[in-house]
From Swiss-Prot:
Residue ranges of the region described as Disordered: 1-28, 61-135, 170-292
Assembly notes: Interacts with S100P.
S-S bridge residues: none
Keyword Nucleus in record: yes
Organism: Bos taurus
Pfam families cross-referenced by the UniProt entry: S100PBPR
UniProt name for this protein: S100P-binding protein
Stored InterPro entries: S100PBP (IPR026097)
Gene responsible for this protein: S100PBP
GO CC term (a single one): cytosol
Phosphoprotein as UniProt keyword: yes
In-chain residues carrying the UniProt-annotated modification Phosphoserine: S195
Compartments in which it is found: Nucleus
């Protein structure tokens, strides 16, 4: 239900709708006959968050006027329009530019009084279609919400310098340990009557010196071979100690020992020539500790033997000529039976039995037609000679474990009786 806004001196900024859908009349707006029932609270209306007194409304409007003076370009409505307030029945409609709406999150108008905040033009929602705010926000809370400060701890370079100093001291200790070891190797090589130039070439080619200067020309093959033999023969016990040292150097890639040296016309890393010696020597140490040479062989799984098929000796075989003769005789009997049946009223089952009886008696006893069920021939599945037992003999052979056959009498086999002889 929509009603027009009517200014009045008594309301001074608040115009209420009729109570409980009461009939509205223009005569009630006369100054002489004012209806005091409009000033009373309607059903369900109380002094809640959306109920303001006249003094509170005036204070809020003064605050808005002050903010408009600071920002004359603000997109707020004029003061005359903001004084017209409209309330819906039981909170179902949203008033136009009410003081509550200025504090609501749906209002984009000027609401802060500090000149540091940026203002957007005011956005008002249409009556009866916008979402109703569940709780009115306090103006001071809204200002504090917009002025949240983010504090970040300043950068402290001393902390990073201390961490870097620790890493540098650790790397320097590792490099000093590594450089001490080649010095002993150089002394051993000098004892083997090697010139100092050759010893410096060997140490520099291995990439152990901090200068890591590569030789201009290819080194002598004798010096390389002697140095490799010296490392493999005299450093077998120190191989376990050498591997963690080089792993630490690989972890700290900031050391100056990561250069490459020229060897036989190709570039190789200084660590690639050292690690294979230590790894191979560690394997030899493990083999010496075990007392015998370890041969790593691939273990095979369990081999299942393949059963070979046994040859069947007792299965009768027929030549193709014998099979062709049996086929022709069978066809002749079938055609003769169709042309001159024995009994035309015997039916399909009787006719089949008569045909099978003829085939059974006319052919050789060694040959059995696949559809002939008068004899049971399991020669293909048995490997021993067939033995015939009576029922009692069969029970005695099975030690009378089947109690249901104890009371059955023994009876001999009877001859096969065809259906047409009955």
């Amino acid at each position: 239900m929509m009603c027009s806004l009517v200014p009045s001196e008594q309301s001074s900024g608040t115009s209420l709708l009729p109570k409980d859908n009461a009939p509205f009349s223009w005569s009630s707006l006369d100054e002489d006959e004012l209806d005091d029932s409009l000033l009373e609270l309607s059903d369900g209306e109380d002094d809640g968050h959306f109920s303001f007194t006249e003094e509170q409304i005036q204070e809020l409007l003064k605050d808005d006027d002050l903010s408009n003076e600071h920002f004359p370009w603000g997109g707020g409505l004029p003061s005359d329009d903001s004084r017209n307030v409209e309330k819906g029945e039981k909170g179902s409609q949203i008033p136009l530019d009410t003081p509550q709406e200025k504090d609501s999150p749906y209002n984009m108008g000027p609401e802060a009084e500090t000149p540091d905040t940026f203002k957007l033009p005011q956005l008002t929602t249409s009556v009866g279609h916008g979402p109703t705010p569940a709780k009115s926000l306090n103006r001071r809370f809204a200002l504090e919400k917009n002025l949240i400060k983010v504090t970040v701890a300043p950068f402290d370079p001393t902390v990073c310098d201390v961490a870097l100093d620790k890493d540098k001291t650790y790397v320097s200790e590792v490099t000093s340990r590594v450089t001490e070891k080649p010095s002993s190797l150089g002394e051993e090589m000098r004892e083997d009557d090697l010139s100092p130039n050759e010893s410096t070439l060997c140490t520099e080619s291995e990439g152990i010196s901090p200068d890591n200067s590569a030789s201009d020309g290819p080194p002598l093959p004798s010096s390389n071979s002697n140095f490799q033999h010296t490392v493999s023969d005299k450093n077998m016990s120190d191989s376990k100690k050498a591997t963690p040292v080089f792993s630490q150097i690989l972890d700290h890639s900031e050391t100056p020992n990561t250069g490459s040296s020229r060897r036989n016309g190709s570039y190789k890393s200084s660590f690639e020539m050292k690690l294979p010696v230590s790894s191979s020597s560690s394997k030899d140490v493990l083999d010496k500790d075990s007392g015998k040479l370890k041969v790593h062989e691939k273990r095979l799984g369990k081999v299942i033997p393949v059963l070979q098929a046994k040859t069947r000796t007792n299965v009768p075989t027929f030549s193709p000529s014998d099979l062709e003769k049996q086929k022709q005789s069978y066809l002749r009997n079938v055609i003769a039976h169709i042309e001159d049946p024995v009994d035309s009223n015997q039916g399909t089952l009787g006719e089949l039995c008569a045909l099978m009886d003829q085939v059974h008696h006319m052919h050789n006893q060694k040959w059995q037609h696949p559809s002939d069920l008068t004899r049971r021939n399991y020669a293909r599945f048995r490997q021993k000679s067939l033995q015939r037992y009576s029922l009692t003999q069969w029970v005695d052979r099975n030690k009378r474990s089947h109690h249901r056959f104890q009371r059955l009498p023994d009876f001999p086999y009877g001859p096969f009786v065809s259906s047409h002889q009955q």
